[in-house]
């Protein structure tokens, strides 16, 4: 320990990466792709995770501190792009929080068997949201037991699901038969709309960089935890996805309850102590997700606010520990608004409605990271790089372009309606409209800041927006 602060060991850092990057609730939407998910996993692990992991390791160990991707993008380009990235990166979090909150009433129903009315369900969702807000007001090292516990529970759920899948496949057969044709991509628009979930499942490594001050040796631990954690996470995802695919036909899979449904099908019962335990553990992983992400998201939002690139309210911090209560409070307010208006939405698959919108905004924040990596190599070659991606200039361009192109293509399939039947429009139009609304709000914030900087020529950011 140093200065009385508990430090992350490498083991804790790896578990934290697993807790951050592996999100159990995303297993079912990925399984909705069908058997071809394994093809996409392999392709995206090589074409996306590898360059993304290498780039994040270099940027995270070279440019340390609270800013994360906001810092990288701002250094490479300007504050306008940094402001966009910080806005998308922050606003996805309360949407994600809302998507997990709406799962809690159904999980409690599975655990205890009683039906909840709308008022009680809303109360449970609000309790989930504001408990997360409260926990996020304390340093991440104070919650290390939540991070480690969340990682262990997620791994247990994935191994149990995959193990039951193997047993069921050997004894009862599979719901989705495996053929060479089914393992190859079909390129139907419904399946392709879920590809962004795989990318989401492979993102998040940069959050570990915001824990640098809590690590024993961040320059070594960050790349080690990303590499080891990435290998473990890829294996966990594919094993758990196999279990879901064994249990439930793809066309009957629920994106919100698919994980618990799979246990119920393979065990042959919708109730019982083990099913209740699975639902309880699954709910604990939702808390772990929010706690592990809240610190990094709030840090970046408040740091950007300090630099004039987010509304000033986000920069408000607790005097006792420097944690941003402004960003935490805004998380709670936005998530509360979302769950309150949820019953009015046309698509009542609320988890997917909010989760997919969170996906779109989250992925948007990453697009500038990859060109920022390449540009920083060109304009800032003298800065020491404890971990440096090797390769020629051509290889670096491939590392830059490949993940960026993959994100853009996945966004098109997720956010833009490419089929015009009523069911498709009901599912995708709210995502499209929601994304446009949040993009416009972000641009209005940037425009307002630009006007303020023009009226205050002494500001250090005035030229950054030009």
From Swiss-Prot:
Gene3D superfamilies: Amino acid/polyamine transporter I. The keyword Ion transport does not apply. The chain crosses the membrane at residues 8-28, 30-50, 85-105, 120-140, 144-164, 192-212, 226-246, 273-293, 325-345, 350-370, 398-418, 426-446. GO terms for cellular component: plasma membrane. PANTHER family: AMINO ACID TRANSPORTER-RELATED, GLUTAMATE_GAMMA-AMINOBUTYRATE ANTIPORTER-RELATED. Belongs to the amino acid-polyamine-organocation (APC) superfamily. Glutamate:GABA antiporter (GGA) (TC 2.A.3.7) family. Probably catalyzes agmatine/putrescine exchange. This is Probable agmatine/putrescine antiporter AguD.
């Amino acid at each position: 320990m140093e200065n009385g602060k508990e430090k992350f060991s490498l083991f804790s850092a790896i578990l934290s990466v697993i807790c951050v990057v592996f999100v159990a609730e995303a297993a079912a939407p990925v399984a909705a792709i069908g058997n071809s998910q394994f093809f996409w996993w392999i392709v995206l692990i090589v074409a996306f995770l590898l360059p993304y992991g290498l780039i994040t390791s270099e940027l995270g160990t070279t440019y340390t501190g609270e800013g994360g991707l906001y810092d990288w993008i701002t250094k490479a380009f300007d504050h306008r792009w940094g402001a966009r990235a910080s806005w998308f990166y922050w606003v996805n979090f309360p949407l994600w929080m809302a998507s997990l909150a709406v799962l809690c009433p159904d999980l409690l129903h599975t655990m205890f068997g009683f039906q909840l009315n709308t008022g009680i369900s809303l109360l449970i969702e609000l309790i989930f949201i504001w408990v997360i807000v409260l926990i996020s007001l304390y340093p991440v090292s104070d919650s290390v037991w939540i991070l480690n516990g969340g990682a262990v529970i997620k791994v247990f759920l994935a191994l149990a699901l995959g193990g039951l899948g193997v047993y069921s496949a050997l004894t009862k057969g599979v719901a989705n038969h495996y053929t060479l044709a089914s393992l190859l991509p079909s390129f139907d628009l419904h399946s392709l709309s879920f590809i962004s979930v795989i990318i989401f499942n492979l993102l998040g490594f940069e959050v570990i960089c915001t824990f640098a001050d809590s690590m024993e040796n961040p320059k070594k631990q960050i790349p080690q935890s990303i590499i080891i954690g990435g290998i473990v996470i890829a294996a966990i995802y594919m094993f758990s996805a196999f279990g879901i695919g064994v249990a439930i036909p793809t066309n009957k899979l629920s994106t919100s309850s698919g994980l618990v449904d799979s246990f119920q099908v393979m065990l042959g019962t919708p109730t019982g102590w083990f099913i209740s335990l699975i639902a309880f553990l699954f709910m604990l992983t939702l808390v772990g997700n929010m706690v592990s992400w809240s610190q990094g998201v709030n840090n970046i939002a408040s740091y950007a606010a300090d630099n004039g690139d987010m509304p000033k309210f986000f920069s408000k911090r607790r005097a006792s520990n420097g944690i941003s209560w402004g960003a935490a409070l805004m998380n709670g307010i936005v998530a509360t608004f979302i769950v309150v208006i949820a019953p009015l939405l046309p698509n009542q698959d609320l988890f997917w409605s909010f989760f997919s919108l969170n996906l779109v905004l989250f992925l948007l924040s990453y697009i500038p990271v990859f060109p920022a990596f390449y540009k920083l190599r060109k304009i800032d070659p003298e800065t020491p790089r404890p971990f440096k991606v090797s390769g020629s200039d051509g290889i670096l361009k491939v590392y830059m372009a490949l993940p960026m192109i993959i994100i853009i293509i996945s966004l098109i399939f997720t956010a833009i309606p490419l089929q015009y039947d009523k069911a498709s429009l009901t599912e995708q139009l709210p995502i499209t409209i929601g994304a446009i609304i949040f993009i416009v709000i972000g641009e209005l914030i940037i425009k307002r800041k630009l006007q303020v900087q023009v009226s205050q020529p002494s500001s250090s950011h005035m030229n950054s927006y030009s």
